[in-house]
Structures are given as C-alpha cells and as structure tokens.
C-alpha cells in the first residue's frame, strides 16, 4: 500500500515518514511541501535519513495520483485543498489537521472515504468513549477539562479538548454550547462544562477531564509522551480506510474495527 504525506517536512510529517518506512506492508509514495521549497525533487528518505525512493513534490495532484491513501498534517487552508483533490481523484484521505470543522468534510465525504480527527492517538480515542460513559453516570456533576501543551501551540482550547467537551455533552444528552462555562462570567451553574488551558515548555499534550461532585472528584487523564503515538495512529487509520465506502470516519471507527 502506497501512502503519501502532505506536510512531509513538518514536525508531525517527519515522524510519519519515519514510521511509514518502519512499518511492514506499506511504503512511501511521496511527500508534499509548499511551493518554492528548495527541496522539491529531492529524495524524501535521503533528506530525512530513512530510506530512498520517494520524491518531495509541491504538487498535491501528483501526490494523490501516485498514492493509495494520503495522510495530511498541514494547515487548514492546505487541508481544504487536499479534501477537494481527494474527492476529485477518489483517493482516501486521513487528516489530523486542527483548526477546521467537520462541516468542511461533509460534502466531499459523499464521494470518497475521509477520516478526520484532532487527535490520532488510540488512547485519546478510548478516553472519549470513557468520558461519554462517565458523563452519563455523573449527571449534575460539574465538569472541568484541563489541557497543557507546548508554548508554540496556537489554538486554545485544543481540538482534543473540544472533542472531550463534545463527548461530555453527548453523555449528558445536551449541546456543549448550552452547558459551557466561560471563565469570568460569574458563578458557575451546576453541571457546567469548563475549559482550563495552559501553555509552556515542550509538553506534547496532556488532557484531563474532571467530574466534580460535592463529595467526590473523578478524573480521567491522557498524557502523550512521544509524538510517534499520533503517527502510528494515523498510519493505522490510513490502512483501515482503504477500501471503505465513501463517508466521513473518525478514530472511533478504527478503534471499534
């Protein structure tokens, strides 16, 4: 199976390339970088020190033409372009790009299998299921979602925190917007869902969901200690997605397989 990488020289892209090279049954078809990058045309494996054979290109269309499935970790603008190309060429796409919305995928998912998740970790995927169960059982408890990331992370709350918030709301049987507590908005009403965000150091990702009752606190937590967990999840998702009917999938579908 040939896997193409969009954003192959980015922080996550480099790790995914290395993991694909070390995974049996799959091979790199190529990688996309921004137009004007001086490495266009170079051997991707040679540049990253992990094998040979796949070229770096600035043409997304070319990458999709030579791939069985494409993995995207880029920018929202680049991701939207990739979704359109995937739909046109009927090539499955796995995207871990944040700062976008499920609605950006819906129309194209009628033509091609797409999988999008703000977090490719199977551990976080399982945490989402546990949070739904806990929220259904702890109705009336206050909920606080805490996150800590490296100093360079731009979006806040993170995409993962928002997924956890939606999981809480689903467990409660409500819409997140109706239950969300905004810091500084006054006293907290019973059962509200709040978000606490911290940035600093080189923390990869630390998320916790606290269910706060009057006489007990229950906390569910996930801590990423190596970015490879996201790369391995993305590769697993890519292998799973090939051959699936058109539609929009999540890591929960992969976990249940």
Swiss-Prot record:
EC numbers, comma separated: 1.17.1.8
Catalytic activity: (S)-2,3,4,5-tetrahydrodipicolinate + NAD(+) + H2O = (2S,4S)-4-hydroxy-2,3,4,5-tetrahydrodipicolinate + NADH + H(+); (S)-2,3,4,5-tetrahydrodipicolinate + NADP(+) + H2O = (2S,4S)-4-hydroxy-2,3,4,5-tetrahydrodipicolinate + NADPH + H(+)
Residues the record lists as binding NAD(+): 7-12, 96-98, 117-120
Predominant cellular place of this UniProt entry's protein: cytoplasm
Active-site residues from the entry: 149 (proton donor/acceptor), 153 (proton donor)
One GO term describing the cellular component: cytoplasm
PROSITE patterns: DAPB
Record-listed NADP(+) binding positions: 34
Enzyme class, broadest EC rank: oxidoreductase
Compartments, as annotated in UniProt: Cytoplasm
Transmembrane segments: none
Alphabetically ordered keywords of this record: Amino-acid biosynthesis, Cytoplasm, Diaminopimelate biosynthesis, Lysine biosynthesis, NAD, NADP, Oxidoreductase
PANTHER family in the record: 4-HYDROXY-TETRAHYDRODIPICOLINATE REDUCTASE 1, CHLOROPLASTIC-RELATED (PTHR20836:SF0), DIHYDRODIPICOLINATE REDUCTASE (PTHR20836)
UniProt protein name: 4-hydroxy-tetrahydrodipicolinate reductase
Gene: dapB
């Amino acid at each position: 199976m040939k896997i193409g990488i969009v954003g192959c020289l980015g922080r996550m892209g480099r790790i995914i390339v290395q993991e694909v090279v070390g995974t049996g049954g799959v091979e790199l078809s190529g990688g996309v970088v921004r137009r004007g990058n001086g490495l266009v045309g170079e051997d991707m494996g040679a540049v990253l020190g992990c094998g040979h054979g796949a070229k770096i290109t600035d043409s997304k269309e070319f990458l999709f033409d030579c791939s069985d499935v494409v993995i995207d970790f880029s920018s929202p603008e680049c991701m939207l372009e990739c979704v359109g190309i995937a739909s046109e060429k009927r090539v499955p796409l796995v995207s871990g790009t944040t700062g976008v919305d499920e609605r950006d995928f819906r129309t194209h998912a009628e033509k091609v299998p797409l999988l999008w998740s703000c977090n490719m970790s199977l551990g976080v995927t399982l945490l989402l299921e546990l949070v739904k169960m806990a929220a259904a059982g702890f109705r009336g408890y206050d909920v606080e979602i805490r996150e800590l990331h490296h100093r360079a992370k731009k979006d806040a709350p993170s995409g993962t925190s928002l997924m956890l918030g939606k999981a809480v709301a689903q467990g409660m049987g409500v819409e997140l917007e109706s239950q969300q507590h905004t810091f500084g908005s006054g006293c907290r009403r019973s059962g509200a869902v709040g978000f606490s965000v911290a940035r600093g150091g080189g923390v990869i990702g630390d998320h916790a969901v606290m269910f706060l009752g009057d006489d007990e606190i229950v906390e569910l937590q996930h801590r990423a200690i190596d970015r490879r967990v996201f790369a391995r999840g993305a590769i697993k998702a890519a292998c799973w997605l090939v051959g699936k009917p058109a539609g929009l999938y999540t890591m929960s579908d992969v976990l249940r397989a």
